[in-house]
Amino acid sequence: MVKPEARLETVEVTADGVGLVSHAGVALLVELTDRVGLTAALSGALAGTRERRSAHDPGRVLRDVAVMLADGGDCVTDIDAYRGQERLFGARASETTTHRVLKAIDERLLARVRSARAEARARVWDAGARPGSITLNIDATLLTAHSEKELAAGNYKHGYGFHPLGCWLDETGEALAAILRPGNAGSNTAADHFTVLGLALAQLPAEDLMREILVRADIGGQTHAFTADCRDAGIRFSVGYELSETVRAAILQVTETQWVQAINAGGLNRDGAWVTELTDRIDLSAWPEGSRLICRSERPHPGAQFTIFDDHGYRYTCFLTDQEGNDIAKLELRHRGRARVEDSIRSGKDTGMRNLPHHAFEHNQTWLETSLIAQDLLCWTKLICLTGELATAEPKRLRQRLLHTAAKLVRHGRRTQLKLDRDWPWSEALVAAFQRLRAIPALC
């Protein structure tokens, strides 16, 4: 017999609980920053801004903001969610102090914060998170400003705000670098692309810079200067290429037998899609030596709207690359993987990027960098602490199932325990995550 469901109004609600902790899973992020040395590195980077020894450590304040963003907050006041829980999270700086720390970070200190991030990343990779290959995805996105902010401007979509350019590591999803730009910044600015690439490379451990690195970009990366800079830096490139009239004419000259079947991620044939190489049909002498032009032809999905440039029911896309190899289907598949950067950007906007709270442009750049730290914390947690579906979960799911877990903090003698609800479906996963993290030697 099924028991009748209890009526909520019969449950007595009081505010006299003792030792209860909400967002208990956030302690995993805090301990992660300590164990991989990020907290100590940030403290060292911002040591000069500490007003007195009794004041809050600026590095820890910045760490707390990053943890708050990783937990789903989007403004400084959201850090209040951890007040009254000092036994687990430690003392939190006031809103005024937090704003003061963020606004004290100028361009020089921002460079030191980036170095601190790189130090922690090297330790995370040494702890087992080093990717098997290195593929950098560069892309821009639009952020709306809902009030007057310094250098906010109209954009090509008739909105108003900023147009940051960022770089994410495809294999792990880590947010390596981003620069804030006015809303009217160009999409194919070579200098901005190379600046972001340089910042991203600086985030990689020194020994990994000796490996083959591929940078991917959409058509915004199709500039002679950027591809030449990639060649000078010893970086392979794969960038979108404009379908000019010359390119379209070359495509129409390709015979049916010169198209090869495109493949999907599993290596199987991709229905309705073919690939061909146009290198010998287009003058690429102005591009770096060894550049190749590859084209994909695909039937648009049912219901898709055709453009006036689609020919014979097919849609064409091209990319320019200096990768070697005769398997052009595999090269096209690798370039197509660039689309995953959209997932990274979406997750980034859900982790502090969407809302830039300050008026000053410099302060919003600091906030953007703090968002990158938050994105990395979630990535590192999945890489070294989680398994199964949680290891690939998006931020919203991680927060709902792990970070927002309720618990009770109890003390027995000299031992302090964080007791999770045994009926919560993901309690065991959170316990296992702490165990995996603590198996890594502490570095601070």
Where are each of the predicted segments found?
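An anionic, glycine-rich sequence signature occurring as long contiguous blocks
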Residues: 1-11, 15, 236-349, 432-444
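Flexible loop/turn segments at secondary-structure boundaries
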Residues: 89, 143-145, 174, 184-187, ...
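Short secondary-structure boundary/capping segments
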Residues: 150-154, 229-235, 252-258
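Short, conserved catalytic/metal-binding motifs centered on acidic residues
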Residues: 32, 64-65, 76-79, 94, ...
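Dynamic "connector" segments at or just before major functional cores
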Residues: 1-161, 166-186, 191-207, 382, ...
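Domain-level cores of phosphate- or acyl-group-handling catalytic modules
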Residues: 187-246
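Basic, amphipathic alpha-helical segments enriched in Lys/Arg and hydrophobic/aromatic residues
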Residues: 354-430
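Short amphipathic alpha-helical "interface-anchor" segments enriched in bulky aromatics
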Residues: 32, 79, 328-381
